[in-house]
């Protein structure tokens, strides 16, 4: 018994010792490595779930959290849900993210990246065109990549890969290089403005900086290619520009690839030589990595990466080559191993990627030998999900948290970037009357985009009303602090309205669409049918918007509605929400399911569910409840209580829509 008590007090003194890192003192030797989450909104903004996710990592007890893969340009994003820092409007979200990390006691670092040829863009940037010498290896790596995924996913992935390979024919010119250098420096300055303590440049994983270093991807004969020093010219130019833009002594780290595992690729001797150049440039630390998307799916690489501390020997050589702090990564699975690597002088810092995501209590459990760490089993489920644009998730997380994460990711496309559709003066008045519904969260909302749909012929009276409405919007929103993005106004003629609206929704990455209700104009109702994966609101004239009824069928659609409400109207003072269910089965089963749903959505366990006994059918029961309860707003899942798999037509939500008089209706798809 005494021995057990003694063990529980045991910690790893070296692992939990402090270390000076640039201007900052790290409280221990543990770093949350950058692992791409895919938790940003489609327009690149920080989402509330991303902030919550990184705050949880910071709360784990690590000394530093590195936010992964922030694109410095639109053509540098590796994912549809990539965090971005290429415009000033991203600064408020980044500032909230940095603040959330630092509030939990960790140093906040933002990793900046340009994905180069791996970017999701029609015209990817790359040092030189792909030639026949590495085409065969790319094709072979595609085979290994495809075997990594279920058969039904392979066709679309193959088509995407072939499309990318075809685009790998146009090399960057001098203008491209100068622009990207500027993109890195400006993004770094935005990170500083947002309150991050450090910035890291991503020079690994086969992304753009790595592509210039590698003879596999850089076939330029001279200048920015050729010999080793020529191939270092571009990344060094980026570093110089970034350091010039940042305040003096602001810490700048570098994610360094030690081995590329491709023909003519970066190997340890060149990596160590480059590390010494980085040290001379004033880099604050080096974070080691290995492999690229061209190599990590090969059987040989999978075997290497399956071993614990597989970069141990290489990082030991790196530490001997430089005097700045080094971070080791690569399956550091236990605190004992982590402590030993620091004690032995293999590395100064321990990087925890997937192990810390698998068990956010890893650090706290390391201080208590009586608690068992949930290990990462290297199943790569998280990687598959990220590649398939489904967001980071872990097979070892509790089921409720996995489900919650899936829901949060689905809401990223309903990203609260709003579009107001207005065609006449009556619409403008309706929007003014429905102001409480338009402002869902004062802390996280931004200016809407107003799309005016008008007749081809000029109407001076209508144009004057539009100007007044724009001014009303500014006067209303500015006092609320909506300053992170400008008010955008778009005007379209009446010809082919619906096509123009759809184009604006897609082009603008709008997640919420507000329309004024008018039963005489069928195009408004058709909007609810056509747009998918959005929040669609039909605004009525009822002035009791604060009294909200939420019909739920306890399907997956209900969970989406619950998460949406938790982020919006449930936070607003003065709103009263009633959750109702038309009972068609056993009340006990419904109550149990409601209890489970509240856990998944993070609802207060005391929120009740009102059960309605239908006299005839579900639609009649709901519409009667809406009318007798004098509700002003209805919020429900688009598929309706019947759980039908078609869009809206014939569903319960369609029936409710037909019977509404002056209420506002929100459909969450």
Give names to the regions the model predicted.
Residues 1-416:
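Flavin-dependent oxidoreductase catalytic cores
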Residues 421-425, 491-492, 515-519, 552-554, ...:
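Structural motif
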Residues 432, 439, 498-547, 626-669:
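Gly/Ser-rich helix-loop-strand patches that form or flank binding pockets
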Residues 32, 110-112, 254, 328, ...:
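Structural beta-sheet core signal
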Residues 413-467, 478-485, 545-610:
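Small/aliphatic-rich secondary-structure junction motif
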Residues 489-500, 613-619:
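Charged docking surfaces used in two-component/phosphorelay signaling
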Residues 104, 248, 281, 322, ...:
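Helix C-cap/helix->beta junction micro-motif
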């Amino acid at each position: 018994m005494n021995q057990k008590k003694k063990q529980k007090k045991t910690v790893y003194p070296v692992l939990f010792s402090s270390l000076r890192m640039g201007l900052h003192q790290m409280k221990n030797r543990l770093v949350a490595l950058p692992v791409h989450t895919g938790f940003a909104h489609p327009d690149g903004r920080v989402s509330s779930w991303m902030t919550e996710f990184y705050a949880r990592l910071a709360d784990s007890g690590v000394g530093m959290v590195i936010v992964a893969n922030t694109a410095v340009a639109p053509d540098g994003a590796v994912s549809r849900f990539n965090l971005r820092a290429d415009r000033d409007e991203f600064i408020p979200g980044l500032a909230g993210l940095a603040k959330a990390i630092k509030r939990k006691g960790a140093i906040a670092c933002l990793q900046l990246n340009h994905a180069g040829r791996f970017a999701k863009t029609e015209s990817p940037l790359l040092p030189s065109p792909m030639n026949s010498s590495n085409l065969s290896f790319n094709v072979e790596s595609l085979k290994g990549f495809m075997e990594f995924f279920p058969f039904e996913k392979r066709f679309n992935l193959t088509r995407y890969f072939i499309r990318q390979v075809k685009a790998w024919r146009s090399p960057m010119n001098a203008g491209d290089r100068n622009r990207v250098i500027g993109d890195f420096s400006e993004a770094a300055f935005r990170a500083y403005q947002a309150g991050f303590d450090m910035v890291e440049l991503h020079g690994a994983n086969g992304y753009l900086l790595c592509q210039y270093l590698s003879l596999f991807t850089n076939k330029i004969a001279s200048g920015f290619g050729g010999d080793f020093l020529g191939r270092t010219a571009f990344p060094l130019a980026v570093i110089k520009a970034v350091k010039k833009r940042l305040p003096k002594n602001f810490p700048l780290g570098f994610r360094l690839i030690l081995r590329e595992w491709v023909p003519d690729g970066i190997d340890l001797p060149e990596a160590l030589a480059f590390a010494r150049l980085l040290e001379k440039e004033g880099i604050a630390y080096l974070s080691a990595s290995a492999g690229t998307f061209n190599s990590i799916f090969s059987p040989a690489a999978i075997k290497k990466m399956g071993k614990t501390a597989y970069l141990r020997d290489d990082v030991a050589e790196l530490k001997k080559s430089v005097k700045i702090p080094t971070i080791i990564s690569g399956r550091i699975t236990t605190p004992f191993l982590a402590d030993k690597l620091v004690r032995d002088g293999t590395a100064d810092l321990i990087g925890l990627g997937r192990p810390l995501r698998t068990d956010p209590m890893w650090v706290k459990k390391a201080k208590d030998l009586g608690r068992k760490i949930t290990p990462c089993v290297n199943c790569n489920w998280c990687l598959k999900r990220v590649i398939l644009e489904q967001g980071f998730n872990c097979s070892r997380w509790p089921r409720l948290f996995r489900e919650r994460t899936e829901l949060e990711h689905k809401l990223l496309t309903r990203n609260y970037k709003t579009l107001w559709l207005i065609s006449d003066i009556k619409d403008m008045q309706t929007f003014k009357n429905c102001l409480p519904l338009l402002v869902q969260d004062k802390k996280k909302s931004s200016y809407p985009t107003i799309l005016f749909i008008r007749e081809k012929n000029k109407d001076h009276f209508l144009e004057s009303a539009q100007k007044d409405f724009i001014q009303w919007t500014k006067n209303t929103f500015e006092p609320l602090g909506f300053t992170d993005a400008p008010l955008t106004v778009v005007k379209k003629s009446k010809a082919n309205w619906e096509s123009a609206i759809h184009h604006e929704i897609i082009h603008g990455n709008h997640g919420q669409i507000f329309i004024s209700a008018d039963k005489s104009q069928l195009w408004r109702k058709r909007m609810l049918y056509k747009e998918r994966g959005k929040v669609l609101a039909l605004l009525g004239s009822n002035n009791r918007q604060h009294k909200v009824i939420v019909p739920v069928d306890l399907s997956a659609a209900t969970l989406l509605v619950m998460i949406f409400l938790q982020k919006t109207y449930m936070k607003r003072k003065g709103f009263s929400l009633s959750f109702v269910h038309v009972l068609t089965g056993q009340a006990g089963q419904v109550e149990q399911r409601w209890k489970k749903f509240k856990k998944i959505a993070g609802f207060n366990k005391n929120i009740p569910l009102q059960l309605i006994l239908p006299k005839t059918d579900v639609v009649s029961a709901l519409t009667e409840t809406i009318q007798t309860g004098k509700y002003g707003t209805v919020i429900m899942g688009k598929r309706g209580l019947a759980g039908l798999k078609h869009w809206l037509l014939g569903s319960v939500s369609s029936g409710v829509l037909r019977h509404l008089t002056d209420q506002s209706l929100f459909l969450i798809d």
